[in-house]
Every structure is written in C-alpha cells, then in structure tokens.
C-alpha cells in the first residue's frame, strides 16, 4: 500500500457541520480536493458555498440544513444522509455558537442554554443519531471517524468573560474522550 492509498479519501462520504466558513469551510475544501463527497450543514443556506467548493473538485460538495440546537433538525439531517448515501465515513462536528460574553453573575440563563444546546448537546445527539451510518461505512480495513472541533478555550482559563464558550468546549473534549 502506498501513501496515497493509505490516506485516500476518494469516494468517502463526509458531513461537516458549520461548513460555510472558517475552519469548517477549510475542512470541506480539503476533503473535496481529495475526492470525497462532502455535505456541509448549517442553519444558513450554503448552496452557493457548496457549488463554489465543488468547482475546485475532484470531489463534490452539497449543502444540507441543520440547527445544532434542535434535536428534530439533527434527526432530519441524519435521515437526509441516510436517504442520500446510506453511510457516513467521516462526521466533523464543527458548528459552534459563541459571542455570549458576560460576567458569571450576569450571564442570562437563556444564553447559557442556547450555547450548551448548540455546542455540547447538539454534537452528542448528532453522533448518537449517526452511529448507524458510521457503522455501515466502517470496514475491517477502514474505520469511520468522528472529529469534534474544539478550542484551546476548553483547556485554559477564560479571557474577557468568554468562560461559557470554554465550558462548552471543555465538555466536548470530555465527550470526545469517550
């Protein structure tokens, strides 16, 4: 087996949440450049982004919808992937909610709930729901993979009252260790 075969993603099916910009978009582009079929999922319509990434080829990029704070939306995403592909080789939990900056004693409970739902509960539910698709893709020669994108904020002391984001990323780090 040569290097290209060992690390090939050609014909793999990949789902990247939060794939419209930044890290997620970069991950999607990289998989497409390796020949994978990539689904980018977001609350926003990413059809134009997917078309742009697909042009770079040789793989393909398509857009799906998901709200990582909604169990119903997560189940719909997995159902769509099941219908379209029947398997999932790689799941990248990249979508995250941030920007709620408050001192601890002034942090609104509803913002805490929104952040934890999107950044911890959502990835947990998505992995749980996608286990069947991941198991279908796995073979004795090639395992399916889950990649949870976290942050240094999950392991360091919070700066500028951004502690809630860090708490969520710390929880995701622990979830990943399971």
In which residue ranges do the predicted regions lie?
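A short, exposed helix-loop element centered on a Lys and neighboring polar residues
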Residues: 127-128, 177
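Substrate-binding pocket helix/loop in short-chain dehydrogenase/reductase
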Residues: 102-104, 108-113
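The beta1-alpha1 cofactor-binding region of Rossmann-like NAD(H)/NADP(H)-dependent oxidoreductases
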Residues: 65-76, 109
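Conserved glycine-rich Rossmann-like NAD(P)H-binding loop of the short-chain dehydrogenase/reductase
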Residues: 34-49
